[in-house]
């Protein structure tokens, strides 16, 4: 069964089924960045309350059980990862690094040859670029990057081809 759920991103498109997943898998603990804890149950912050989302149900989810600690190593039933701060798309953006699998879940921070939006509440372009350069681009170049949207990439590919990181 599911032993935990880690939220890189609090946007409604990433969390809309969270309570259903919790219920279906016996309420595993949920981890979020402390700075975004209230976003799970605040529609204006998780973006489900925006006028442009008329087709999405307003989300008021149960609170998370735990907060991430940056650079802390987590082991959930054999899945070992650590948390890197990659704010900028949102104030509490994080990326999850799985060293044994040689990959990172970058949420909405880093995409193939692009980066996340910074025009939403608490977005900050400079903070996003700094976080990506200081945290993600120091990972081994062969690491795969799995973003919150779109195709996978690698650290090497982004160093070479991402126009935002030049």
Tell me what each language-model feature is.
Residues 72-77:
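Short acidic-hydrophobic surface loop/beta-edge motif
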